[in-house]
């Protein structure tokens, strides 16, 4: 497909005054030369008219020379140009120099076209001479009336359409191709593949076009002419991305003030400005955004919508990527699940089934049982498996890797996907590959081994077999297996034991038939790891996939995962998302190019045109300067986080599980009704709470948010709801800390007035808040109000960015991991212990791993390390006392416990001897922080726990 567009070259800026002064003598010589040449041309016709025999004498030798050149033998031909060609080239060069000089003298004059279609002034005589020797060329209807002065040698693609067979022109359209009425979208094409000469790139199905404009730039045509490509794309606004990419965000930045990486200045990429709707062209390490107008035509081996571009970049910091039409790169391991037989069956292709990725074919309905001689081998296999179990160390650190999920193949929401997580990987390593380690004769009977493996898997204890549930499919109406990694369909009813290929991993929402142990539930999935910036550099982004990966690994190292019920997540449906967010917000951030094919094209076209992204300094794309966006994976990860928290909350509310911890990302408590900000797209905790309300699973719900940033999205969602009590402990600094909301006087509205409690810490980091301040807030404000509210379920936005180890822009507080564990224990005294923690913020890997470990240990009821003596005995700082006093004063008219504290201020802060006059007056006015009065409101069985020394 020829994509050349007649476009004028960019006008060069006027030279500097110093250069003009140096060029004046040269211009004068040029003007004199041109004047003499024009005078000579004007005198030449007069000489020809006065002396007619002279042209004949002059033409004679030229005519004879031309005849000799035309009739020269092939063996005598050379590359030396004739005098006529030299003269013609000299005239063309002279004319170009004259045009360049005129543009320099008059910079504001309109530029000349890229190629002059009119004949040159001096070619009339030459054409008359050559017309008698050169045969006439038949003209085509599409040719201009005059031939080009200099025809390019590589011009075959210009004539490609003329000789295209009529049969290919009349071929019907492939049903798998994108509909013409579908909204326009983008295709990300990695720049490395354009210039790569490796075999992997040379065999790419989508090889691009071979027009002269592309081939004239060498081996890397697109990267060598970024400006020209940008001008071409600007002329095709109907097919460019339906969103603009501003460079400045109007939303507040959560990372404002963070120091840039050391190498930020050295490798920062520069992007030419191409207008408000222009594409973004990056460096050789930045993917290019190409519209569908530049995609190869259909009719190849694969439809243009399904032609991948495989990129193997060993020098990059990220994993190998697979780029498909869209904006985001795919990890290489997802390529196998994307190119499934089911998706390519409509194109008429028959790909052979790879035996390395598929499993053995299931037996027929009349398959006989294993023969008798195989019994000794089965016993030997059983012994070998037991030896492997005994040799495995529970404290050994597992190897974390991203396992491909079939969830990405689900383009509509709601149903749980066939996703494999790290827990399943552990199971497969222990029970899916014993034949590779056993004796050689056993490898000849894979079917028998699969039967034995499944029989052994049913006998192994729950904690040692992994974190997911493998159940054979029931006979009858079962859900069909995903075709991503399974072999061809098997008969519905089998008399023989079902092999492992007929076992599927059930998500947490599909396991109600199995009785879950009444313990702590953990939820995690590798789908959420794919939400990454296209730059591949995690050091530039505080919120990255390594956060949940590190937490999941820490829980495995400490043996906590084996004590919990590890569940599978699911993707939240669009209807569930719309219970909190607007339809526009859900369609913008809850769909990807694959899932949009099943939605209303007319509605999507208008919404996508309103979507705005920003260009990040790293070269990626984001909703704002903090929140990165990956067109293929961000929507799936955000929906998976929301669905996982919702599913875990339902299991705890129905008492299938005692409590739970959701290791999810991206976070959600900053996402409000129609805005994504602060790393958040969908408010997972708010969605779970709303779903519990709509399905009458809980009448009163308490949401505690101890993230150092205020949960503005959660507060906005339930600001007028009296059935949801929202309590937030956050750094406020009088509105000068992100996101700026969460003041003490924000207490709710309407019927929900008083059900919004903000413990807004003030005073900055002089000194920073720590364990004494958070313990005082929990004992003075959080727990008394929560007991008076008496919730049925407790949801916790468990952000750990208040933990020690975070820089000042991301928190700067010094809360210990033991304090987070203690606060979790306190919340378990509410709602019968029905507590669900969902990971929110926290970006220091060591801090969030320690805090998560302490919280999970508290949920399990294990012995938590006691707080330090300093944390118990040290009194809160003056800024914290003032903040707590403000909360008591504001909420004294809504809660009885706060009213009693406000009426007796002298009873909860003792006098501090030896303090200066100002501090003594403040402390005397604010009263004591003793917990003696609080003991009157607590049940008798809790007095023993509260009698710990609290000399604050």
From Swiss-Prot:
Residues 512-865 are annotated as: Histone deacetylase. Residues 167-181 have a biased composition (Basic and acidic residues). Changing residue 43 to M: In a breast cancer sample; somatic mutation. It is an enzyme of class 3 (hydrolase). It holds the Pfam family Hist_deacetyl. Residues 197-212, 482-503 have a biased composition (Low complexity). Its EC number is 3.5.1.98, 3.5.1.-. This is Histone deacetylase 7.
């Amino acid at each position: 497909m020829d994509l050349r567009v007649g476009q004028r070259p960019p006008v060069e800026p006027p030279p500097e005054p110093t250069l003009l002064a140096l060029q004046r003598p040269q211009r004068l010589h040029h003007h004199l030369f041109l004047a003499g040449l024009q005078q000579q041309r004007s005198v030449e016709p007069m000489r020809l008219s006065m002396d007619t025999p002279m042209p004949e004498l002059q033409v004679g030798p030229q005519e004879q020379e031309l005849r000799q050149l035309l009739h020269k033998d092939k063996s005598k031909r050379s590359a030396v140009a004739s005098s006529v060609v030299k003269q013609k080239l000299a005239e063309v060069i002279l004319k170009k120099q004259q045009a360049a000089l005129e543009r320099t003298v008059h910079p504001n004059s309109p530029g000349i076209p890229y190629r002059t279609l009119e004949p040159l002034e001096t070619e009339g005589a030459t054409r008359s001479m050559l017309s008698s020797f050169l045969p006439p060329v038949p003209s085509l209807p599409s040719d201009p009336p005059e031939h080009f002065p200099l025809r390019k040698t590589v011009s075959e693609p210009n004539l490609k359409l003329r000789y295209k067979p009529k049969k290919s022109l009349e071929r019907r359209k492939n049903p798998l191709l994108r509909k013409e009425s579908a909204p326009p979208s983008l295709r990300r094409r990695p720049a490395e593949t354009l210039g790569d000469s490796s075999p992997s790139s040379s065999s790419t199905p989508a090889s691009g076009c071979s027009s002269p404009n592309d081939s004239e730039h060498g081996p890397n045509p697109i990267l060598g002419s970024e400006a020209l490509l940008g001008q071409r794309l600007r002329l095709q606004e109907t097919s460019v991305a339906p969103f603009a990419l501003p460079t400045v965000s109007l939303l507040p930045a959560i990372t404002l003030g963070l120091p840039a990486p050391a190498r930020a200045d050295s490798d920062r990429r520069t992007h030419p400005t191409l207008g408000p709707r222009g594409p973004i062209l990056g460096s050789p390490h930045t993917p290019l955004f190409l519209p569908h107008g530049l995609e190869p035509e259909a009719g190849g081996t694969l439809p243009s919508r399904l032609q991948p571009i495989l990129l193997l970049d060993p020098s990059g910091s990220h994993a190998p990527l697979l780029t498909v039409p869209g904006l985001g790169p795919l990890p290489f391991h997802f390529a196998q699940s994307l190119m499934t037989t089911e998706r390519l069956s409509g194109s008429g292709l028959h790909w052979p089934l790879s035996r390395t990725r598929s499993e053995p074919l299931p037996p027929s309905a009349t398959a006989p049982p294993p023969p008798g001689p195989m019994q000794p081998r089965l016993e030997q296999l059983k012994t070998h498996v037991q030896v492997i179990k005994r040799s495995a160390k529970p404290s050994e650190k597992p190897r974390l890797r991203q396992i491909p999920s079939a969830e990405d193949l689900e383009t509509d929401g709601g149903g749980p996907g066939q996703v494999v997580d790290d827990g399943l990987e552990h199971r497969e390593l222990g029970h899916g590959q014993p034949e590779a380690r056993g004796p050689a004769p056993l490898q000849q009977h894979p079917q028998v081994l699969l039967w034995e493996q499944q029989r052994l898997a049913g006998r192994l204890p729950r904690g040692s077999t992994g974190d997911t549930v493998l159940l054979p499919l029931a006979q009858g109406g079962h859900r069909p297996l995903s075709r991503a990694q399974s072999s061809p369909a098997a008969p519905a009813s089998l008399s023989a034991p079902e092999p492992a290929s007929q076992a599927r991993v059930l998500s947490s929402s599909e396991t109600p038939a199995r009785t879950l142990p009444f313990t702590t539930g953990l939820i995690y999935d590798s789908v959420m790891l794919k939400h990454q910036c296209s730059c591949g550099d995690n050091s530039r982004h505080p919120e990255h996939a390594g956060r949940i990966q590190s937490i999941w690994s820490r829980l495995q190292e400490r043996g906590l995962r084996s004590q919990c019920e590890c569940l599978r997540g699911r993707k939240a449906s669009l209807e569930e998302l719309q219970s909190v967010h607007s339809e526009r917000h859900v369609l913008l951030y809850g769909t990807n190019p694959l899932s949009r094919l099943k939605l209303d094209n007319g509605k999507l076209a208008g919404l996508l045109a309103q979507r705005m992204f920003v260009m990040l300094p790293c070269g990626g794309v984001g909703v704002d300067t903090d929140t990165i966006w990956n067109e293929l994976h961000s929507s799936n990860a955000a929906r998976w986080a929301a669905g996982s928290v919702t599913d875990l909350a339902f299991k705890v509310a129905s008492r299938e599980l005692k409590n739970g911890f959701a290791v999810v990302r991206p976070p959600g408590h900053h996402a409000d009704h129609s805005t994504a900000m602060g790393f958040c797209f969908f408010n997972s905790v708010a969605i779970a709470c709303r779903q519990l309300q709509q399905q009458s699973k809980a009448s009163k719900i308490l949401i505690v948010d101890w993230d150092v940033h205020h949960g503005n999205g959660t507060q906005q969602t339930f600001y007028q709801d009296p059935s949801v009590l929202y309590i937030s402990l956050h750094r406020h600094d009088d509105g000068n800390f992100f996101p700026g909301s969460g003041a003490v006087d924000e207490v709710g509205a309407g019927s929900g007035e008083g059900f919004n409690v903000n413990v807004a810490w003030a005073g900055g980091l002089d000194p920073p808040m720590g364990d004494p301040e958070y313990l005082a807030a929990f004992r003075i404000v959080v727990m008394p109000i929560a007991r008076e509210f008496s919730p049925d379920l407790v949801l916790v936005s468990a952000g750990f960015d208040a933990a020690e180890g975070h820089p000042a822009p991301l928190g700067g507080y010094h809360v210990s991991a033991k304090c987070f564990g203690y606060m979790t224990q306190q919340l378990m005294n509410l709602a019968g212990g029905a507590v669900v923690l969902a990971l929110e913020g926290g970006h220091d890997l060591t801090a969030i791993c320690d805090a998560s470990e302490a919280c999970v240990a508290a949920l399990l009821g294990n012995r938590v390390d006691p707080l330090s003596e300093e944390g118990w005995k040290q009194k809160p700082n003056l800024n914290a006392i003032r903040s707590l006093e403000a909360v008591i004063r504001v909420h004294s008219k809504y809660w009885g416990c706060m009213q009693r504290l406000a009426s007796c201020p002298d009873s909860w802060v003792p006098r501090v001897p030896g303090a200066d006059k100002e501090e003594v007056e403040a402390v005397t006015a604010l009263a004591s922080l003793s917990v003696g009065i609080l003991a009157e409101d607590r049940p008798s069985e809790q007095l023993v726990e509260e009698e710990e020394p609290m000399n604050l």
